[in-house]
Curated annotation (Swiss-Prot):
It holds the Pfam family DUF188. This is UPF0178 protein YaiI. InterPro entries: UPF0178. PANTHER family: UPF0178 PROTEIN YAII. NCBIfam families: PRK00124.1. Belongs to the UPF0178 family. Signal peptide: none annotated.
Length: 154
């Protein structure tokens, strides 16, 4: 089990939660980005720097993740690809992706694109709230417990 992070767009507060979780869970945490990242010294935490470019980090995560891994991303197409490989996906607000939630998100994204194309100002997502951070941490723990149980039952 490895936790992969689409790190270029991941909020720092979520990375901090992940650093602590990697130590507590004693799981590898790999932050994939096209820029240098500062991470705390740990035998569980490492960075993987990729070339700059469209979807380069996403493609590397898809290439390396395995069934049972967890991918942290807000990128819906990336979440869809890792689910197809048997990994789990969680966004920084604590929403676990499923095929149904991905379809719903893609429909909403297409709708918002249509609104923007017609000249309507739609704005961006709300800032990450303390409640979002708590929800993320709770879902991360839930994933870990489920994965641990599954591994022990094998």
């Amino acid at each position: 089990m490895t936790i992969w992070v689409d790190a270029d767009a991941c909020p720092n507060v979520i990375k901090e939660i992940l650093y602590r979780a990697a130590e507590r869970m004693q799981l590898p945490l790999i932050l994939v980005a096209n820029q240098s990242l500062r991470v705390p010294p740990s035998r569980f935490i490492r960075t993987l720097r990729v070339a700059a470019g469209f979807d380069v980090a996403d493609n590397e995560i898809v290439r390396q993740c395995e069934p049972g891994d967890l991918v942290i991303t807000a990128d819906i197409p990336l979440a869809s690809e890792v689910l197809a490989k048997g990994a789990a996906a969680l966004n920084p607000r604590g929403e676990r992706y499923s095929e149904a939630t991905i379809r719903e998100r893609l429909t909403m994204r297409d709708f918002m694109d249509t609104l923007r194309a017609s000249g309507i100002q739609t704005g961006g997502p709300d800032a990450l709230s303390p409640r979002d951070r708590q929800h993320f941490a709770a879902e991360l723990d839930k994933w870990w417990l489920e994965a641990k149980r599954k591994k022990e039952s094998m």
